[in-house]
Every structure is written in C-alpha cells, then in structure tokens.
Amino acid sequence: MPKGKKAKGKKVAPAPAVVKKQEAKKVVNPLFEKRPKNFGIGQDIQPKRDLTRFVKWPRYIRLQRQRAILYKRLKVPPAINQFTQALDRQTATQLLKLAHKYRPETKQEKKQRLLARAEKKAAGKGDVPTKRPPVLRAGVNTVTTLVENKKAQLVVIAHDVDPIELVVFLPALCRKMGVPYCIIKGKARLGHLVHRKTCTTVAFTQVNSEDKGALAKLVEAIRTNYNDRYDEIRRHWGGNVLGPKSVARIAKLEKAKAKELATKLG
C-alpha cells in the first residue's frame, strides 16, 4: 500500500431521519435581567439557614445539655441510675390529684385563720384549739425523720434533684423501713404542691377516710413498681451509650478488620 493514501472503508448508511419535536421557545422578557448570586465569602448576603448548631447558648443551657450527654456516655452506678425510672404518667397524674387535696396552707390562709381565731377570742367566745388537718410533709430532713419513725405512708421523690446526693439514700432507707416510695418527674411539680418553686421530696402521713381507698390503690401499684423490684433496680447500671461519631469510627475499624481477615483467608 503506497504511502500517504488512506484506506477507504465502507461507508455506514446514515440513520433514518428522526422527526424532531419542535420545542416551543420560551418568550423571555428582555426587561428581566439575570442576576445570579454569589454566596462566596464576603460576597452576597447568605440565605436563611438553620444555624442552631452554631448558636452560643446561655451557660445554664450548655450545662444541662452537657450533663445529659455525660449521663449517656459515662457508666452511671445503679444508685443514681434508679432516678431515670420515673412513675408512669397515668399513675403520676392520679398521685398528684390526690396530693393536691392535701396541700399545706399558704401564708395568707394562715394569717386569716389566726386573725379569725383572735377575733373570736377578743369577742369572749373562748379559744378552742382546732385539730391540725392532714397535710403533705415536705423536705428531705422532715421526710427522713418520718420514714425512720415509720410515720410516712407514701414517699414521693423528684427525679431531677441537683445535687442528687441530697436524696440518693432515700430509696434504700424507705425499703429498709418498709415504706412505699416512688420517683416522679419534676421537682417543680412537687414544689407547686407545697407553694415553693421546687421541692426534693414529699410524704403522705395521714389522709381523710374518703381518700384511704385511693391511697391504698396507689400504694399497691407503687410498691409493685419500686419496693418489690429493688433488687433488680440495684443491679441495673446506666449510661455507656456511645455517640454517633464514636459508633461510626468503631464500625469503620471493624469493617477494615473484617476486610483484612477476608484477604488473609483468601
């Protein structure tokens, strides 16, 4: 074959003409100008994004979030972990409804009662001391004394007491003395019962005869959930839950190990 000449191959027949669909051209208004935005650093104003992750939160919010994460990451001993097992909502509602009937009197109510008594005494009608009505007893020291003397019928402890050391001994003491106890969500709810912002623990000492049946039912349910399960609760550790980054890192290492083992085995 002489140099410079190209070999002629067979020409492929052209494809049959495909009828092209004619697209309707969009009518563009020349008055509308395209002005694309540049979201680079120092350029256009950034679009609205969810920046929750980058917010500098107040100190108390940071602390409570860090505390919650620490409780998940670290191994939590059973004595502290038992405070995560709060009473179910239905039983807690019934308990609070009953406790609401036995709220102690406010300062204003006490003042009015004493004033009425003083007026009666001044009028010469005689001073007859009234019997103290059954009310809730609040506070760690008061409740501890009542439990030790076996005068408490039911003890209610808040789950979020800070520092937790204030009430960490109470469940063990209640079980030892045979007093039914329960852990309820919210120290503020207990505080509301006794006209304070928060309250660590409250106790029932006496109730009126019409409420004895309701209290007995509650005590039975609470005893089953807490006092009778004490040995099980005592063995149950909490926390030790890794975060998503750690889980992903461990999974990656495991995957690499499995791959290496597979190549060795062939």
UniProtKB/Swiss-Prot annotation:
The modification N6-acetyllysine is found at residues 34, 97, 217. It is found in: Cytoplasm. GO terms for cellular component: cytoplasm; cytosol; cytosolic large ribosomal subunit; membrane; nucleolus; postsynapse; presynapse; ribosome. InterPro entries: eL8/uL1-like (IPR050257), Ribosomal_eL30-like_sf (IPR029064), Ribosomal_eL8-like_CS (IPR004037), Ribosomal_eL8/eL30/eS12/Gad45 (IPR004038), Ribosomal_eL8/Nhp2 (IPR018492), Ribosomal_eL8_euk (IPR001921). One of its GO terms (molecular function) is RNA binding. Pfam families: Ribosomal_L7Ae (PF01248). Keywords: Acetylation, Cytoplasm, Isopeptide bond, Ribonucleoprotein, Ribosomal protein, Ubl conjugation. It comes from the Eukaryota. GO terms for biological process: cytoplasmic translation; ribosome biogenesis; translation at postsynapse; translation at presynapse. Component of the large ribosomal subunit. The ribosome is a large ribonucleoprotein complex responsible for the synthesis of proteins in the cell. This is Large ribosomal subunit protein eL8. It comes from Mus musculus (Mouse).
